[in-house]
């Protein structure tokens, strides 16, 4: 498992421009990520997803996020997420640790 404090820095640098994590957070260019773990792709209430995201049908968890965050457009062809991915394994683990902590109570 990664380091949530390091993951927070990665989130701020690479994700916060488009995403929020707080329970009352607003959608930005990307969806609010509160409740991410255990939710199916394309299911954040009130966010307009591509058909590719809605039909992917996987449930977000550590393993699926680990693979997705390496190369989002390869994992979900047709996603509108304009992020190249995080190639370093330890950075993905840190980010996932932060997301797990910050997107649930």
Curated annotation (Swiss-Prot):
Entry keyword Heme: yes
Post-translational modification remark: Binds 1 heme c group covalently per subunit.
Binding residue positions for heme c: 15, 18-19, 81
PROSITE patterns assigned: CYTC
Cellular location(s): Mitochondrion intermembrane space
GO molecular-function term, one example from the UniProt record: heme binding
N-acetylglycine PTM sites in chain numbering: 2
UniProt record, GO biological process: mitochondrial electron transport, cytochrome c to oxygen; mitochondrial electron transport, ubiquinol to cytochrome c
InterPro entries, per the entry: Cyt_c-like_dom, Cyt_c-like_dom_sf, Cyt_c_1A/1B
Primary location group: mitochondrion
Sorted UniProt keywords: Acetylation, Electron transport, Heme, Iron, Metal-binding, Mitochondrion, Respiratory chain, Transport
Gene Ontology CC: mitochondrial intermembrane space
Source domain of life: Eukaryota
Record bears the keyword Heme: yes
Xref: PANTHER family: CYTOCHROME C (PTHR11961)
Family of this protein: Belongs to the cytochrome c family.
Main function: Electron carrier protein. The oxidized form of the cytochrome c heme group can accept an electron from the heme group of the cytochrome c1 subunit of cytochrome reductase. Cytochrome c then transfers this electron to the cytochrome oxidase complex, the final protein carrier in the mitochondrial electron-transport chain.
Protein name (record): Cytochrome c, somatic A
UniProt organism field: Xenopus laevis (African clawed frog)
């Amino acid at each position: 498992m990664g380091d949530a404090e390091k993951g927070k820095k990665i989130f701020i640098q690479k994700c916060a421009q488009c995403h929020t994590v707080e329970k009352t957070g607003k959608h930005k260019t990307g969806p609010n990520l509160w409740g991410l773990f255990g939710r199916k792709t394309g299911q954040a209430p009130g966010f307009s997803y591509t058909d590719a995201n809605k039909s992917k049908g996987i449930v977000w968890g550590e393993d699926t996020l680990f693979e997705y965050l390496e190369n989002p457009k390869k994992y979900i062809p047709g996603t509108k997420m304009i992020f190249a991915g995080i190639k370093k394994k330890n950075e993905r683990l840190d980010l996932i640790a932060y997301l797990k902590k910050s997107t649930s109570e």
